[in-house]
Amino acid sequence: SLVAHVVDGSLDGHAISGMAGVSNIGTERNWCGHPFGAANWYAFGRLAWDHRLSSEQIADEWLRMTFSNDDRFVERATSMMIASREAVVDYMTPLGLHHIMARSHHYGPGPWVGLSQTDGRADWTSLYYHRADERGIGFDRTATGSNAVSQYCPPFRDLVASVETCPDELLLWFHHVPWQHVMKSGRTLWDELCSRYNRGVESVRAMQRTWDDLSEYVDPARAEHVRALLRIQEKEARWWRDACLLYFQRFSRLPI
């Protein structure tokens, strides 16, 4: 069943139902720190009332009430918002990588966390999750590894259990894949990993250009605030890309 059918009560025939979530609001003047961060708070409330809404519909509503009702602004800003999640995935954890952030504060890259004996319990470290070595990268959760894949029902279990059919975005979560494995794109795994990290950085730069074009529809203070935050994001996207690729290159021994 869809989670939505649990929330609306239709799965078990409940007349009264609800949902709970962790808020991202705080003491900042704009509540969420980032002007666009409030969109997540708004989306939670809207989905609690109507889970059938699409991301595009929610973004359209929020943008019109927050920045401008001009269609020329809303159309491009909506596209920017919809693309933003995959941009972050690309420059932080592409192809199903996971939990490779720095220790304790979780801010910034840390694929090397686990090399030191002071890095805490093994299954909380980056090394435990990415398992990069000279042969490849990724966590084998199939029958030849942890067999975590057995917890899923078919047909999803069968889909992800095979390297050949597993979606790219889940590949390294379920499989330890050789560096020279040929991906669906025709690139090797290593080249695809490099491509995804670079694509993430370029996506942020595209958002910067889009926001520069859209700033005329927004008051100067908020326009500059978002512009400044995008500069930080672009810098941090490069930080993630460079740190992760240079670390993984120690094992792949292939050119970036």
Where are these regions (language model features)?
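Catalytic domains of carbohydrate-active enzymes that cleave complex glycans
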Residues: 2-256
